[in-house]
């Protein structure tokens, strides 16, 4: 089984997570849509978004600060995020800030088959809260991914399931973000429908 390397910037890892499965509390969902959020991304005023989060005491700041957060998943705004490699923020005494990836869409997998249950799990038209809380049953925050020390296993496991060729992975602007970056990635719908 291929290991997922979380020591990559969000814009690369977000594409690689497409086709992987999230296993949690006995449920399995294939990731179909992701959004990358680089730590050093600038907002409309030209400030780093991580700086804005800290100055506004944003909840996302604590779970994205420090190299020890790489490979951690967390629920923020009712949605599942994954912290990955970022860099040093110059604004706050060279503090390490992680990039993060939002899991915006997923499809249920049962008995190694993709199940067409997209209405509640297509987060553009559905409610992202449904996947995290109702379907996967994630209630706590800052969960390590794929942790196994012999006695303790993590609550959330992300594993290799399918790989998609670059021509089957599309990109566009992120939802509710006012810049031109195409950091939203998704598997071509026609490609998924062939598997159902």
Task: Label every PLM stretch briefly.
Residues 1-196:
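Conserved, well-structured core segments that form or line functional sites
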């Amino acid at each position: 089984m291929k290991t997922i390397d979380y020591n990559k910037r969000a814009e690369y890892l977000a594409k690689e997570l497409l086709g992987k499965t999230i296993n949690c509390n006995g449920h399995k969902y294939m990731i179909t849509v992701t959004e990358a959020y680089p730590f050093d991304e600038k907002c409309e005023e030209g400030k780093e978004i991580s700086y804005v989060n800290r100055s506004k005491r944003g909840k996302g700041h604590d779970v994205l600060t420090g190299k020890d957060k790489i490979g951690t998943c967390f629920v923020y705004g009712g949605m599942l995020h994954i912290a990955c490699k970022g860099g040093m923020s110059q604004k706050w005494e060279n503090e390490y800030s992680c990039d993060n990836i939002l899991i915006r869409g997923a499809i249920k997998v049962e008995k190694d088959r993709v199940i067409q249950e997209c209405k509640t799990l297509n987060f553009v038209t559905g409610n992202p809260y449904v996947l995290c809380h109702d379907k996967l049953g994630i209630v706590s925050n800052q969960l390590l991914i794929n942790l196994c020390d012999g006695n303790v296993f993590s609550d959330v496991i992300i594993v290799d399931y399918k790989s998609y060729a670059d021509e089957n992975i599309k990109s566009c602007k992120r939802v509710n973000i006012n810049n031109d970056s195409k950091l939203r990635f998704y598997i071509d719908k026609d490609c998924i429908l062939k598997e159902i």
